[in-house]
């Protein structure tokens, strides 16, 4: 699954950014949310009470880091602050985000595959290793509110998921010979073998 950044740049990741209408309905997610909010700011006009139009919207930019930085215990009652200092329940923001990504993926699957039903999918959400039970419960309830069935949902710790990815990702073994294209090398790929050494680094919330 790829996302468009800036209208043309394709990326396998997108921003954890959400734009909600004044009535708290999801308007846009990811790079699209950033683009739409920037446009709202540019086109904004003052209303009769001196409030700019864009200030009526809820804009949570990179809200995943807000969850990392929440003071105290992260619970189902935790509130997070948007870019204009308006607060909403973290559970609402997470639920809308998960629901969007779920529906986005299902739409792509239906376009590319035949016979895949929603019940065929088991969803795995990665969470920080330092999260306690209350934070995990927040994420579980958010996922269920986002439309994922409880019996089709599992969690994996982010470092463990990164480690499994390192074991399964195919790496270039060698470049030898030439392909049918002049000057192009023929590459050999394989997954890591038993005994392969690798390192998973945590850079301030970003897992490599």
Question: Where does each model-flagged region fall?
Answer:
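Short, flexible loop/turn elements at secondary-structure junctions
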Residues: 67, 129-131, 157-160, 202-207
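Short acidic, glycine/serine/threonine-rich loops at helix termini
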Residues: 136-139, 165-169
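Secondary-structure transition/capping motifs at alpha-helix termini
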Residues: 145-151, 174-177
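Conserved phosphate-binding/catalytic loops in two-lobed NTP-binding clefts
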Residues: 147-161
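Extended hydrophobic secondary-structure segments that form protein cores and membrane-embedded regions
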Residues: 121-128, 155-156, 198-202
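Phosphate-binding loop and its immediate beta->loop->alpha context
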Residues: 2-146
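Gly/Thr-rich phosphate-binding beta-strand-loop-beta motif of the actin/hexokinase/Hsp70
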Residues: 1-3, 56-58, 170-208
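Phosphate/ATP-binding catalytic cores across multiple sugar-kinase/actin-like superfamilies
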Residues: 96-115, 166-189
């Amino acid at each position: 699954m790829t996302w468009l950044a800036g209208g043309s740049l394709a990326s396998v990741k997108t921003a954890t950014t959400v734009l909600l209408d004044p009535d708290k309905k999801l308007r846009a997610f990811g790079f699209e949310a950033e683009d739409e909010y920037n446009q709202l700011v540019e086109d904004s006009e003052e209303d009769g009470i001196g409030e700019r139009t864009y200030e009526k919207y809820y804009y949570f930019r990179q809200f995943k880091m807000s969850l990392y930085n929440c003071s105290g215990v992260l619970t189902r009652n935790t509130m997070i602050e948007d870019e204009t200092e308006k607060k909403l329940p973290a559970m609402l923001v997470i639920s809308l985000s998960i629901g969007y990504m779920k529906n986005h993926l299902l739409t792509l699957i239906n376009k590319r595959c035949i016979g895949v039903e929603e019940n065929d999918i088991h969803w795995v959400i990665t969470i920080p290793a330092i999260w306690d039970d209350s934070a995990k419960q927040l994420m579980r309830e958010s996922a269920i509110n986002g439309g994922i069935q409880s019996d089709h949902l599992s969690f994996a710790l982010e470092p463990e998921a990164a480690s499994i990815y390192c074991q399964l990702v195919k790496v270039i073994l060698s470049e030898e010979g030439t392909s049918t294209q002049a000057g192009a090398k023929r590459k050999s790929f394989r997954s890591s073998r038993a005994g392969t050494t690798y390192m998973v680094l945590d850079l301030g919330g970003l897992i490599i």
